């Protein structure tokens, strides 16, 4: 049986120094495993890494052809503890240069949500879900 867990997510970066700086501006600290060609950030339960997109394609043995401005059909989420945090986080994202795609609003399913894109158009949701359950480390364990 395959373990039911996601432990590491890698974003293929077009401009690693610029993207690294954006995530540092979020206040996220890099791990000791980061290098000039790789950035790793510990989050609550998942490691987020940044790796040059051409190198990522090479590592996966695929041909790199993606337009940097195209939608990548994947999104990441930052789940929060309170609905008001969605608004304050989006304001912080706006201040550091993130592109707000959807302003904070109440969701039809009872939560609060907003979307932004980082400098390379990776899609992020900032969300409060009233059903979310977090462990003592802040990792979401259920919703």
List the predicted regions and their residue ranges.
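Vicinal oxygen chelate
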Residues: 1-8, 28-83, 87-117, 130-143
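Residues within well-ordered beta-strands of beta-sheet-rich folds
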Residues: 10-12
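Amphipathic alpha-helical segments
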Residues: 14-29
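Conserved active-site tyrosine of GNAT-family acetyltransferases
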Residues: 19-23, 93, 121
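Short glycine-/small-residue motifs
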Residues: 123-126
């Amino acid at each position: 049986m395959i373990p039911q867990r996601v432990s590491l997510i890698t974003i293929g970066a077009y401009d690693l120094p610029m993207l690294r700086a954006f995530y540092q501006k979020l206040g996220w600290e890099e791990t000791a495993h980061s290098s000039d060609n790789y950035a790793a950030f510990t989050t609550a339960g998942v490691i987020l890494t940044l790796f040059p997109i051409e190198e990522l394609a090479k590592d996966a043995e695929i041909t790199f052809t993606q337009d940097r401005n195209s939608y990548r059909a994947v999104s990441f989420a930052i789940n929060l503890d309170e609905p008001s945090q969605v608004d304050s986080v989006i304001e912080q994202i706006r201040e550091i240069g993130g592109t707000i795609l959807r302003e904070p609003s109440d969701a039809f399913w009872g939560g609060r949500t907003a979307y932004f894109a980082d400098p390379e158009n990776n899609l992020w949701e900032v969300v409060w879900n009233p059903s979310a359950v977090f462990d003592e480390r802040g990792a979401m364990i259920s919703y």
